[in-house]
Amino acid sequence: MASLFERPSLVFGAAIVLRAILLVYGAWQDAHSAVKYTDIDYMVFTDAARYVSKGDSPYARDTYRYTPLLAWLLLPTSWDGFFSFGKVLFALSDVVAGWLIAKALTSFYGMSPPRALKYASVWLLNPMVANISTRGSSEGLLCVLVIALLWAVLNRKITLAGVLLGLSVHFKIYPFVYGPSIIWWLDEEREGLKSSSQKQKPEQDDRNLLTHIFNFITPSRLLLTTTALATFSGLNISMYILYDFPFAQHTYLHHLTRIDHRHNFSPYSSLLYLSAAGDIQGSFESLAFIPQLLLSVVVIPIVLAKRSLPGAMLAQTFAFVTFNKVCTSQYFLWYLIFLPFYLPSSSLMKNPRLGITVTALWVIAQALWLQQGYYLEFLGLSSFVPGLFLASLGFFAVNIWILGIIINDVALEGC
């Protein structure tokens, strides 16, 4: 096994072959089974691309809730014989993300290439990751942007990091949570800007709030913030000019009051179902953001970012997904991408029994939910209450426990 990781061509070749097999199998299942392999979102993407190819708006396709950039990227799917172009693009994006992970582990963490590749394989050879991308989920593209962002920050390429952060948030809203962690991580000591005179007078600095404020505003923080805002604003203004209010409505505003109770692991799913049916009244869809954002945008960055930026980003993402009012399997990729950075020093590796228990409970909790989902989707049985609701609570409880382990590891070990 050790020799495998000493030969990158074998690992990346295996990752590509795994995805190629799933692509071929997916085409066969789509043609021969009532249960389709291709994700319904991919049909939405390709329909939107077809509208764009005809000179129309991608938002002419109902339920297209994404940036027009995605429809533009998938324009080849409107050509004869190129329907699976997007799936191939997403699958290759997975592999590129894995390459960036290995590169970051060697350049910043000083790992040997074989050891870095071993941990990168947690992503590259993960069947869940390969399955989701080959079904037509675009998360692989986003994961490339996020890991490229992390690599750029760790290697002090601040302008590039700002561009990638702005592009990532434009592509999908949630990466904005990384902004506070990155800014907090970029302190004076890392930039080498704090003078010896400043270091010799901590008591004086503590009494001077204005000094702290000025010390916080460093060149790197300013550059990152302005570059990210300029990129995000430039893209949004351009898209608004092209597609007017439907762009803002479907890409951003829709998600503030989104009601989606199908394929939703969140404990909010039953409430969303009742809300969609008109059985309950209230604004809980918006209130659900409070614990989610408090944890992922405020508490975790302040507590963890200076200990470990990748660890803080993992904890932020895990908290964001766990507390999100909509939680689907695709969202798991958002935090799985950070596992190669967290695992080497984690308690899950130091205590294999704990690692196996965490993995088993995470999988079992999903399986119990999927069983109830099968009763609902395929057998037509009403399983929202108590089946799906209890399964969602169980999965939520498991994730809260895992989040506690991650936060503790990062705080104590700097994972």
Swiss-Prot record:
A GO biological process held by the record: GPI anchor biosynthetic process
Top-level enzyme category: transferase
Transmembrane segments: 8-28, 82-102, 134-154, 158-178, 222-242, 284-304, 329-349, 354-374, 387-407
Keywords, sorted A to Z: Cell wall biogenesis/degradation, Endoplasmic reticulum, Glycosyltransferase, GPI-anchor biosynthesis, Membrane, Transferase, Transmembrane, Transmembrane helix
Domain of life per record: Eukaryota
Molecular function, one GO term: glycolipid mannosyltransferase activity
S-S pairs: none
Compartments (UniProt record): Endoplasmic reticulum membrane
EC number(s) given by UniProt: 2.4.1.-
Membrane topology: Multi-pass membrane protein
Pathway of action: Glycolipid biosynthesis; glycosylphosphatidylinositol-anchor biosynthesis
Entry's Gene Ontology cellular component terms: endoplasmic reticulum membrane; glycosylphosphatidylinositol-mannosyltransferase I complex
InterPro entries: PIG-M
Function: Mannosyltransferase involved in glycosylphosphatidylinositol-anchor biosynthesis. Transfers the first alpha-1,4-mannose to GlcN-acyl-PI during GPI precursor assembly. Required for cell wall integrity.
PANTHER family listed in its UniProt record: GPI MANNOSYLTRANSFERASE 1, PIG-M MANNOSYLTRANSFERASE
Recorded family membership: Belongs to the PIGM family.
Protein's name according to its UniProt entry: GPI mannosyltransferase 1
Lineage, top ranks: Eukaryota, Fungi, Dikarya, Ascomycota, Pezizomycotina
Gene: gpi14
